[in-house]
From Swiss-Prot:
Belongs to the peptidase T1B family. HslV subfamily. Allosterically activated by HslU binding. GO terms for cellular component: cytoplasm; HslUV protease complex; proteasome core complex. This is ATP-dependent protease subunit HslV. The gene is hslV. GO terms for biological process: proteolysis involved in protein catabolic process. One of its GO terms (molecular function) is threonine-type endopeptidase activity. The keyword Cytoplasm applies. It comes from Salmonella typhimurium (strain LT2 / SGSC1412 / ATCC 700720). It is found in: Cytoplasm. Disulfide bonds: none annotated. It holds the Pfam family Proteasome.
Length: 176
């Protein structure tokens, strides 16, 4: 598994992920980039789950973004509908965390599109640890979104055996 965390604060949104890929109990690669930019760099997305499945979902999500002129929520709902109802897509095992300037969402294969409280997302095996750390930092510090995401990933990497300390971080800034 993995850890993906997204934090939104003071006009900045960040999605960050670790780089560990495992096959069963064996680490196969330590520098996988599980976070990327989509739709002309206006959307950032991260995945937890099977790498090949996630890349397929990224491609489909980018097509949905193009169909809906970059409208994140509409594209997410359409992807979730297809993911749930299409016989082949239903077999894909991954979770997506996506964000643009205004919204942060979790998209699941069950057809769920969730906009979490406080615009804080944490998915994957280290998600609960990263979420707890990020929430504590959001509530008790003035750190920026990027610093919070980095610290949350570090803490998850210290606790979760399926999360490492190689980070990929993407950030968007809201236009003034």
């Amino acid at each position: 598994m993995t850890t993906i965390v997204s934090v939104r604060r003071n006009g900045h949104v960040v999605i960050a992920g670790d780089g560990q890929a495992t096959l069963g109990n064996t680490v196969m690669k330590g520098n996988v980039k599980k976070v990327r930019r989509l739709y002309n760099d206006k959307v950032i997305a991260g995945f937890a789950g099977g790498t090949a499945d996630a890349f397929t979902l990224f491609e489909l999500f980018e097509r949905k973004l193009e169909m809906h002129q970059g409208h994140l929520v509409k594209a997410a709902v359409e992807l979730a509908k297809d993911w749930r109802t299409d016989r082949m897509l239903r077999k894909l095992e991954a979770l997506l965390a996506v964000a643009d300037e205004t919204a942060s969402l979790i998209i699941t294969g069950n057809g769920d599109v969730v906009q979490p409280e406080n615009d804080l997302i944490a998915i994957g095996s280290g998600g609960p640890y990263a979420q707890a750390a990020a929430r504590a930092l959001l509530e008790n510090t003035e750190l920026g979104a990027r610093e919070i995401a980095e610290k949350a990933l570090d803490i998850a990497g210290d606790i979760c055996i399926y999360t490492n300390h190689f980070h990929t971080i993407e950030e968007l800034t809201a236009k003034a």
